[in-house]
Amino acid sequence: MILGIGSDLCNIDRIAGVLERHGDRFRRRVFTETELALAGRRRHEAATLAKRWAAKEACSKALGTGLAMGISWKDMAVRNLRGGQPTMELTGWAAERLAAMTPPGHRAHVHVTLTDDHPWAQAFVVIEALPDDAQAGTA
């Protein structure tokens, strides 16, 4: 069952401007070390970070809170699976909110898709509740 849906559209040039004005202070406030390491290896750092910004915004909307209720930017981290597929790792208040909205007997899965076409970066997040594996075969 779908627990939450969120989307966000971010202007890459806006993020580039913030990076130019605030540099590492902005980077450290919003992004995890893993996200920053990935962006540092990419040709277009601003586009990479703009997609992650959009993903965090979209995830906060899917959680039903926005960036409120104690959820911070770093509580939501975009990771990439081996094949490059993005996924979202939640910690802190974001993880607590996810646990609170997940029905008993289910586990949450956060689906993430990212795209960019200059000057826009977009993210879409769907939070799904899946039956626990132990109960999947019972009816």
Swiss-Prot record:
Its EC number is 2.7.8.7. Transmembrane segments: none annotated. It is found in: Cytoplasm. Its cofactor is Mg(2+). It holds the Pfam family ACPS. GO terms for cellular component: cytoplasm. One of its GO terms (biological process) is fatty acid biosynthetic process. It catalyses: apo-[ACP] + CoA = holo-[ACP] + adenosine 3',5'-bisphosphate + H(+). It comes from the Bacteria. Keywords: Cytoplasm, Fatty acid biosynthesis, Fatty acid metabolism, Lipid biosynthesis, Lipid metabolism, Magnesium, Metal-binding, Transferase. The keyword Transferase applies. GO terms for molecular function: holo-[acyl-carrier-protein] synthase activity; magnesium ion binding. Mg(2+) binds at D8, E57. Disulfide bonds: none annotated. Transfers the 4'-phosphopantetheine moiety from coenzyme A to a Ser of acyl-carrier-protein. Belongs to the P-Pant transferase superfamily. AcpS family. This is Holo-[acyl-carrier-protein] synthase. It comes from Paracoccus denitrificans (strain Pd 1222).
